[in-house]
């Protein structure tokens, strides 16, 4: 069946592929990614080469400009953002969305509600002390995931591993990657870690088609955040 073929092509992109990963992809937390594999492979055909992980200079200048602007906004507003999370100290993993696939959800910092050409989702996750995620896959490859540790952790036990590549936030607070690859975030320290997460449209030969597809996806997913982030407390 075409779905199985697409799934096999999709999962084979992993550098760390083994029987455990294949099982997780088809039968575990990658099942939705498997179901969406035909769409994700179509996105690959429309887009520039997928490097899996990226430096900001790997992206076109328009993408770089928006990323740098968002980073600046998070740096300017980090105290205001942290105050929002102070009311939920009992929750180990907490999340806040400013935009979700282009829909504005929180206007406490108006600049995050600007209409961006490439950025479609803007949010913040808080990992409290000794808190990590399980291994998981993002569902869609129409966008790349940008993570930015704006409270600048100082210790090495706070990091992300994406298909075998480890990024320690102490040394590089910005990480851009294809989140349909298996990944896992760790905070093994006794400190909080705030992480901005941003979804940006993949650089593409057919930008308008990508935007049109994402608009349709946004309509479908408008009220589904809790499905994708069921292990998180939303504020």
Where are these regions (language model features)?
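A short hydrophobic beta-strand segment most commonly corresponding to one strand
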Residues: 145-150, 174-176, 190-207
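A short glycine-rich, His/Asp/Glu-containing loop-to-beta-strand
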Residues: 111-129, 142
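Long, compositionally biased interface segments
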Residues: 198, 202-235
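Short, conserved beta-strand element in jelly-roll/cupin
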Residues: 126-128, 139-155
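Non-heme Fe(II)/2-oxoglutarate
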Residues: 2-112
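Short beta-strand His + acidic residue motifs that chelate non-heme Fe in jelly-roll/DSBH
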Residues: 133-136, 159, 177, 183-189
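Short acidic-glycine-tyrosine-enriched beta hairpin
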Residues: 163-176
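Intrinsically disordered, low-complexity Ser/Thr/Pro/Gly-rich regulatory segments
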Residues: 88-92, 115, 230-235
């Amino acid at each position: 069946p075409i779905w199985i073929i697409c799934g096999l092509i999709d999962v084979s992109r992993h550098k760390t592929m083994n029987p455990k990963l294949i099982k997780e992809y088809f039968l575990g937390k990658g099942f939705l990614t498997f179901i969406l594999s035909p769409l994700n492979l179509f996105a690959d055909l429309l887009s520039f080469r997928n490097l899996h992980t990226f430096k900001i200079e790997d992206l076109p200048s328009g993408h770089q400009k928006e990323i740098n602007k968002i980073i600046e906004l998070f740096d300017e507003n980090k105290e205001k953002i942290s105050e929002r999370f102070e009311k939920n100290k009992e929750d180990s993993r907490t999340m806040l969305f400013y935009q979700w696939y282009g829909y504005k959800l929180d206007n406490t910092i108006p600049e995050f509600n600007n209409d961006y050409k490439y950025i479609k989702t803007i949010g913040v996750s808080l990992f409290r002390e000794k808190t990590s995620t399980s291994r998981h896959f993002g569902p869609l490859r129409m966008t790349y995931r940008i993570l930015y540790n704006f409270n600048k952790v100082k210790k090495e036990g706070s990091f992300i591993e994406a298909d075998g590549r480890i990024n320690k936030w102490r040394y590089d607070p910005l990480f851009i990657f294809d989140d349909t690859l298996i990944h896992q975030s760790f905070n093994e320290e006794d400190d909080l870690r705030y992480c901005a997460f941003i979804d940006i449209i993949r650089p593409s030969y057919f930008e308008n088609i990508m935007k049109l597809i994402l608009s349709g996806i946004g309509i479908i997913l408008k009220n589904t955040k809790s499905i994708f982030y069921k292990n998180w407390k939303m504020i």
